[in-house]
């Protein structure tokens, strides 16, 4: 499940105020289906292991195995990390509050190892809906953390808060 599931957006460019994260996720999947019908979406499966090498990975899920030339992992920073084959890359999250016990994959500019990339908070970034482009989003959360006296920030409102 995505962290967006519990979010509410009141000040995100192009998104109406009060939009729920759960609605945004559903609309995004519908948009992907309608705009890119040739892209296969895999629902209800969880990756349990990644093996092989760049250009010839085997991604094993709880239901099937898939072949991939490149793998992008963007599953959040929850602990424990349960994808076999990547355990040696797991480190404490460098930008999350230590008491949250979050993890990231060790990477250089998102590259974990040849052919495997981490994105979002799993790559060591802070969580933010895409309202700034490129590295500007990371810079924005760095500045917000500075303004917040060094306390890491999550940049979206949440229901019930």
Where are these regions (language model features)?
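Glycine-rich beta-alpha-beta "Rossmann" dinucleotide-binding loop(s) and their flanking helix/strand
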Residues: 64, 69-102
């Amino acid at each position: 499940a995505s962290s967006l599931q519990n979010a509410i957006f009141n000040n995100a460019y192009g998104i109406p105020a009060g939009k729920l994260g759960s609605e945004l996720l559903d609309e995004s999947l519908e948009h992907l289906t309608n705009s890119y019908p040739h892209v296969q979406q895999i629902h209800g499966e969880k990756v349990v292991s990644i093996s092989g090498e760049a250009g010839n990975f085997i991604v094993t899920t709880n239901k099937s195995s898939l072949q991939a030339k490149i793998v992008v992992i963007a599953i959040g920073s929850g602990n424990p990390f349960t994808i076999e084959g990547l355990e040696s890359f797991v480190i404490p999250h460098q930008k999350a509050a230590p008491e949250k016990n979050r993890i990231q994959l060790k990477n250089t500019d998102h590259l974990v190892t040849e052919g495997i990339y981490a994105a979002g908070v799993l790559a060591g970034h802070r969580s933010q809906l895409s309202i700034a482009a490129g590295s500007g989003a990371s810079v924005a959360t760095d500045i917000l953390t500075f303004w917040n006296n060094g306390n890491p920030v999550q940049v979206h409102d949440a229901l019930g808060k």
